[in-house]
From Swiss-Prot:
BP GO terms, sorted: isoleucyl-tRNA aminoacylation
Keywords assigned by UniProt, alphabetized: Aminoacyl-tRNA synthetase, ATP-binding, Cytoplasm, Ligase, Metal-binding, Nucleotide-binding, Protein biosynthesis, Zinc
Domain free text: IleRS has two distinct active sites: one for aminoacylation and one for editing. The misactivated valine is translocated from the active site to the editing site, which sterically excludes the correctly activated isoleucine. The single editing site contains two valyl binding pockets, one specific for each substrate (Val-AMP or Val-tRNA(Ile)).
Database matches in InterPro entries: aa-tRNA-synth_I_CS, aa-tRNA-synth_Ia, Anticodon_Ile_BEm, Ile-tRNA-ligase, Ile-tRNA-ligase_type1, Ile-tRNA_ligase, M/V/L/I-tRNA-synth_anticd-bd, Rossmann-like_a/b/a_fold
Positions that bind Zn(2+): C895, C898, C910, C913
EC number: 6.1.1.5
HAMAP family hit by this protein: Ile_tRNA_synth_type1 (MF_02002)
Protein source organism: Helicobacter pylori (strain ATCC 700392 / 26695) (Campylobacter pylori)
EC class of the enzyme, as a word: ligase
Catalytically driven reaction(s): tRNA(Ile) + L-isoleucine + ATP = L-isoleucyl-tRNA(Ile) + AMP + diphosphate
Cellular localisation: Cytoplasm
Cofactor detail note: Binds 1 zinc ion per subunit.
Residues that hold ATP according to the record: K613
Protein name: Isoleucine--tRNA ligase
Amino acid sequence: MEEYKDTLNLNTTTFSMKGNLSVNEPKTYAKWQEQQAFKRMQARKDNHGDFTLHDGPPYANGHLHLGHALNKILKDIVVKREYFKGKKIYYTPGWDCHGLPIEQQILERLEKEKTSLENPTLFREKCRDHAKKFLEIQKNEFLQLGVLGDFEDPYKTMDFKFEASIYRALVEVAKKGLLKERHKPIYWSYACESALAEAEVEYKMKKSPSIFVAFGLKKESLEKLKVKKASLVIWTTTPWTLYANVAIALKKDAVYALTQKGYLVAKALHEKLAALGVVDNEITHEFNSNDLEYLVATNPLNQRDSLVALGEHVGLEDGTGAVHTAPGHGEEDYYLGLRYNLEVLMSVDEKGCYDEGIIHNQLLDESYLGEHVFKAQKRIIEQLGDSLLLEQEIEHSYPHCWRTHKPVIYRATTQWFILMDEPFIQNDGSQKTLREVALDAIEKVEFVPSSGKNRLKTMIENRPDWCLSRQRKWGVPLAFFIDKRTNKPCFESEVLEHVANLFEKKGCDVWWEYSVKDLLPPSYQEDAKHYEKIMHILDVWFDSGSTFKAVLEDYHGEKGQSPSDVILEGSDQHRGWFQSSLLIGCVLNNQAPFKKVITHGFIVDEKGEKMSKSKGNVVSLDKLLKTHGSDVVRLWVAFNDYQNDLRVSQTFFTQTEQHYKKFRNTLKFLLANFSDMDLKNLERPHNFSPLDHFMLETLETISAGVNSAFEEHDFVKGLNILMAFVTNELSGIYLDACKDSLYCDSKNNEKRQAIQMVLLATASKLCYFLAPILTHTIEEVLEHSQALRIFLQAKDVFDLKDISVSEKLHLKEFKKPENFEAVLALRSAFNEELDRLKKEGVIKNSLECAIEVKEKALDENLVEELLMVSFVGIAKEKLSETPAFTLFKAPFYKCPRCWRFKSELENTPCKRCEQVLKER
């Protein structure tokens, strides 16, 4: 039989089974950069509209990790998908360059070098150099992922023009009356010595003291209640704030119970508190909280008065129903203080230590001066004496600084805020608050997943005013002048635009370098002595939140349209970039700066735990790329439900590699089997068999399914449809049935040529759907197939576009085989019986069989093809019988060329093979 091997169509392709991705991909990516692939993508337009994905900036510090890869790969898939649909695409990657982490890096370096740098300009220069260094590192690492974008001209928040744009956005906020200076409690990082915005706070578990303290009512209050003794019992987990207590808040219209021992608590909580031993069991009096308002108690720590007030924030689920109130250390306390005109006491310095205010205001004795508040808590608790009713330790969720990961405190300071509830004029002349405008805007935005809408909505509903000012150096300054004659900020347009122009030309370092006079426009310079600079910098979330203006609006559409079609970030950005962008967009334009928000989860280990170096469960991105290649990493991203957290381990990547090999080997098989086709046959109509029609109709059906899934950004659903098709209909049915014709028929055989056209159409669809994900691999596929390039009219991957199979193959309709489901059912039953006969050693393969089918309406040729038997009909030697069919030994001899049992003489080719051999 060996002599016939060379007569078979055992075609090959130069497309390798092994991708050797880690070696070949960098060459491809270098070629794309050299050819300016992204510019070419932007130049192509098929009149299917524009698409802008606005990039949320990563921080220009450190190397990339797998979380960065997840985010950028998803963006790249979304952008390329829109590109291959024929849209003009815009995607400008960017970097967040200002902020505390870089400052800390520079300070640590200076400390190691044992040098100090008081000059703010030189310090900022070092910060800028650090950001530049890591920006370039990260840029090259992104390119290794096969990500394409305008990396030649990315946006950087530290560029002079960008800093000016950020400042101009701030000016708009000020002009609309939403920027105000306030003395109020805010999150304060004593580790960073700076204010924090809500987005810069993360919640982690922390152990804290939990204490119940009795505040005795003063004599006049006892007389009003007509009782001899009564103490309101408060519960707190921040004993260090007791020094600043000025009030006790009760729930409005609630019943409060006085016990025999004189403890006053909410009646709804009395039983629980008695069980803890905080109060005694017997109730002697009951009071409505409204009757307790304006009574006065005594703070046992410093004997200062504490007013009884009523607060909407007081709950009856935990605690005592009596809330310790210190307006200098809590936002709800602060707002209650405004209603009751309470004193704001705050005697804690930037480092979190008690300052001299504790002595001046007689809040604590001088031994506490300079002591950190958390360290002082033990002594404070001891000082309470008999007023301490119970002390425990609890573990609870507590705010921490997201940069230092240390606990934060609430501390009243003078800061600049964007006001959420101050009405301002809209485009239509009406007045709404920023909170109202933002909530209205959310309703017009699409969210993927849809749960993101309520998440963002709830955050906007409940968020406080936005604290903008930071007491640092590396950032855009809050560059306003205070007029010392009025003690008010100067918001004159001439002054503000002059500063903005200086920033655009020379960078905002000038705010530190120049004198007040040099920063003012000429017409104001005579009065320079009356002005002083505000020396705060802006919250970096304002930088990133105004990127839509700096990138999309300031370039007048050159870098994309505003509002952008899509923004795509991790789910943590609901409290970060999504909010800051939304709020600034609503101030500037009365609308969200984006139409759709897509969110993804986080990278966790195989157990679902967060990755950390201390746990030793970090998976190195660099190692993954070297082991598997970027296309496998990209496929892993797309083959996962990215809307939830993504589990990572070597096992998961090994599984993904198997998926990749399945796609690659399928494409290799397809390429090999139409590699010998006559290119003249590409455009002419073909006579397709019923089985071909089944395959082509299936191809169009699954194409619709994949397109639908990809439109919804459900890549895992689309890929599962594609993988099921490749495994079942393509490999499991069609290719098995066609191998005989592909290998053994004449090259000019019409049936074989029609099959090759089906394979070509299938390969083209696989290329189209996989190109946004496996861009390098599909580029490689096209390099190795001239037929595919001609069929798709694509010289490389960037020329790809969707095709209609029916139009391309001149088909007006698909003629699916009659009774096809019945033939497939027969095939399934046949394969079961075949396996049994193989195990018993009766036969070796299906070609040894003849089959008699009980259902006479079935097409015999189709049965022979799909079951891969040599004969359909009755033969002499019965092998087995089932209700649906009878199996016989094939009645003819084995053909030495095609191995089917169709030869009339032993060791002689069958009639088909004999004819093929004559034509050679």
